[in-house]
């Protein structure tokens, strides 16, 4: 499922490459990528952009319980893929977007020399609503947004993005 979604996101970005010259590379703290994400954003028209990113987190833990060593590793990979509508004049825009976050979870552990693992993949619908500063001629890029995740319960994060448009 993840491979099909990545293919769809790649095709979207490739097809949009003929319509505009505005590319942006930026880092978003928190937001749609959980703790952080590295993102590529492409302007399709002067009001529409598409975005794909990569974020991840690895946590390792070792404990001793009743004389038994327990080790655990959790790796979470997040790939936000969104389309955005931009409203406003000049360099200052309101950004409204929606898409999905592809999630991959790998859990491995060892208890008393017995290895075990668990892996899961999925997609979480997401959105964003916020402010975007981007010059049409390129240069410094900034965004601040609210990023809801529509899982069993809605969870909202805030995101701050800094980067470069070219």
What spans do the regions from the language model cover?
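Solvent-exposed loop/turn segments connecting transmembrane beta-strands
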Residues: 24-39, 55-58, 121, 147-159
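Membrane-embedded beta-strand positions in outer-membrane beta-barrel channels/transporters
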Residues: 26, 37, 80-82, 126-128, ...
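Gram-negative (and chloroplast) outer-membrane scaffold detector with strong preference
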Residues: 41-146
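Polar-ligand-bearing catalytic/cofactor-coordination segments
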Residues: 165
């Amino acid at each position: 499922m993840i491979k099909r979604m990545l293919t769809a996101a790649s095709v979207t970005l490739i097809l949009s490459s003929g319509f505009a010259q505005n590319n942006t590379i930026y880092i978003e703290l928190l937001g749609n990528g959980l703790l952080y994400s590295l993102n590529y954003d492409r302007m399709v028209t002067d009001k529409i952009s598409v975005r794909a990113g990569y974020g991840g987190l690895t946590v390792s833990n070792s404990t001793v319980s009743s004389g038994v060593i327990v080790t655990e590793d959790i790796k979470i990979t997040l790939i936000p893929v969104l389309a955005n509508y931009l409203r406003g004049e000049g360099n200052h825009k309101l950004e409204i977007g929606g898409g999905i976050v592809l999630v991959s979870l790998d859990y491995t552990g060892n208890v008393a020399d017995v290895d075990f693992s668990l892996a899961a993949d999925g997609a979480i619908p997401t959105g964003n609503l916020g402010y975007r500063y981007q010059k049409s001629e390129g240069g410094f890029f900034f965004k601040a947004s609210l990023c809801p995740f529509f899982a069993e319960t809605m969870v909202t994060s805030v995101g701050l993005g800094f980067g470069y448009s070219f």
